[in-house]
């Protein structure tokens, strides 16, 4: 389940130059992020880990602002939103995706994974850079 609209403003992932020890680092593997921290089902624990290690992380806080059960999706959870974009955007009241979205998947102390939901492109952004947040929750 994802929020019907983006968080009000673009925000930084946060905690730049600081590795989050509670969140696995996910590197490139033939151009694809794989492993613990990137998978479907990892977003909730990633978000909790981010906030444990850095309680001021704007993207994770933005996702949690919807409620305790909401979280920043992992990169593969975000990719599922891309794969189901047409279905999601057909829901009454759903605001169309725009530009890049943060995932809860960390790359290293300086970067985190993001996805351009219109095209499906995945890549990295500096943690101090700003992107959109679309919160999700498990069901």
Question: Across the structure, where does each feature detected by a protein language model lie?
Answer:
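Short aromatic-cysteine micro-motif
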Residues: 2-71, 75-76, 80-82
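C-terminal, surface-exposed recognition/capping segments
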Residues: 5, 56-60, 65-69, 75-139
